[in-house]
């Protein structure tokens, strides 16, 4: 199977990745404190909150004409009681500065509502334009649009602030939603790229009309059943899966619960300094109505690695004739490139806070980032195809069969001269039609296209005429 070959590339890339003596700050502390069995899970889980601290960086990509942001969509698949709560602790720790800011914005909204409730006058001013960007997975479409419009009104920059969604139990998050995963899938699909727009026009005075720019990073945790429900055939065909980073966490039956090492206080303090510096590159502390300027991060030194990855996987796709490998290698590379850019920016931020003799040389940073890209690219492709590969190949085969059908003849012409209701069902399936026999037969009888022969059999009229 082709995924075994990808797995071979992955193991070499993983070995090189874990040979890195110094990962970027924040990542370093959490990965080093993690037991071996969960290191991959923790590394990728950290990328979602870290992307929020890097929301102002823009990166040119070899195969894109426009700049990219660093949005990432992480889906951790694990059974119940498997230690997923550790991911909650880690992301909460990384997001602490952002959460404090987000909570202060929520407090401004609540204060306005209190003043509005106490005031006898209706003229208390417009509600404040707030920056509430940490959204539950259960947030409605209308509320998402309201949040995006509020951010745009405040900063004058559509999509300038990335939304962040964390869900420790994805299935529970949408249990009360009338649309289930549908709205969530659409939001996640359009928010992967900087140019993504999201909105509605329902013609209701209670709704938000129009579209907004949405950029979002997310970290979802869920059981295999929930994730299979989220990534159904329609969502796979529409591109949700190709945008996702699938992170499976499997433990052997009867294995002990993972035990994390404590992080030294000195490491915690330094990580906080790095996060504070990154936070200050997002929000302008001197002007509450301004974001910090976008920052172009050039990691073109990765281009050779990107081309190498694509060449290796393109050759494999041709060798095994797999459209799944050929399709999913492309966005695997994009997501890995974004992860590499985040790590590169953190390395440079870390160096700014260190004495010269403690700084990591630029050549070493670039070498480390190359290893990070290669590991991430193969991991994303391998995990996606390892879990959903058969489904993807089946979907591709169905699409091929659909396009092979020449629809010059309809159901009537395709049927034999004498046919039954069962024949109608069979031929309808071959032509991908959904018309039931109980509605077709009365119509054809009324229009004198068929005659009933009895015993549940029918004959075409032109066949009767030809036999005379």
Q: Which residues fall in each region the model found?
A:
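Phosphate-handling catalytic cores of nucleic-acid transaction enzymes
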Residues: 1-468
């Amino acid at each position: 199977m082709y995924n075994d070959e990808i797995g071979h590339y992955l193991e070499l890339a993983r070995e090189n990745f874990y040979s890195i003596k110094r990962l970027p700050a924040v990542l370093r502390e959490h990965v080093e404190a993690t037991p071996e069995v969960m290191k991959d899970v923790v590394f990728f889980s950290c990328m979602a909150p870290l992307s929020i601290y890097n929301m102002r960086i823009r990166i040119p990509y070899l195969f894109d004409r426009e700049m990219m942001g660093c949005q990432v969509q992480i889906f951790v698949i694990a059974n119940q009681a498997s230690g997923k709560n550790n991911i909650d602790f880690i992301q909460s720790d990384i997001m602490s500065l952002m959460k404090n800011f987000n909570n202060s914005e929520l407090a401004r909204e609540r204060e306005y509502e209190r003043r509005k409730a106490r005031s006898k006058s209706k003229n208390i001013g417009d509600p404040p334009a707030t920056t509430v960007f940490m959204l539950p997975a259960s947030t409605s479409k209308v509320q998402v649009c309201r949040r995006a419009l509020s951010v745009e009104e405040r900063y004058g920059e559509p999509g300038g602030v990335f939304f962040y969604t964390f869900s420790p139990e994805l299935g529970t998050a949408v249990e009360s939603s009338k649309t289930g995963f549908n709205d969530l899938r659409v939001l996640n699909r359009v928010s992967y790229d900087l140019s993504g727009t999201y909105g509605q026009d329902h013609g209701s005075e209670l709704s938000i009309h129009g579209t907004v720019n949405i950029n979002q990073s997310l970290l979802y945790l869920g059981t295999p059943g929930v994730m299979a429900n989220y990534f159904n055939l329609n969502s796979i065909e529409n591109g949700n899966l190709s945008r996702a980073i699938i992170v499976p966490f499997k433990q052997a039956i009867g294995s002990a619960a993972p035990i994390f090492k404590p992080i030294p206080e000195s490491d915690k303090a330094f990580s906080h300094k790095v996060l504070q510096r990154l936070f200050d590159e997002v929000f302008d502390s001197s002007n509450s109505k301004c974001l910090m300027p976008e920052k172009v991060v050039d990691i073109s030194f990765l281009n050779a690695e990107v081309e190498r990855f694509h060449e290796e996987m393109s050759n494999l796709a041709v060798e095994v004739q797999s459209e799944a490998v050929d399709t999913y290698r492309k966005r695997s590379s994009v997501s890995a490139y974004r992860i590499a850019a985040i790590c590169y920016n953190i390395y440079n931020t870390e160096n700014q806070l260190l004495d010269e003799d403690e700084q990591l040389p630029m050549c070493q940073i670039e070498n480390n980032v190359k290893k990070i890209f290669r590991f991430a690219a193969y991991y994303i492709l391998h995990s996606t195809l390892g879990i959903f590969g058969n489904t993807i190949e089946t979907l591709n085969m169905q699409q091929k069969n659909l396009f092979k059908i020449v629809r010059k003849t309809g159901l009537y012409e395709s049927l034999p001269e004498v046919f039954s209701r069962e024949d109608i069902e069979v031929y309808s399936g071959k032509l991908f039609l959904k018309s039931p026999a109980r509605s077709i037969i009365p119509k054809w009888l009324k229009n004198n296209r068929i005659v009933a022969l009895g015993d549940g059999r029918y004959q075409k009229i032109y066949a009767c005429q030809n036999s005379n």
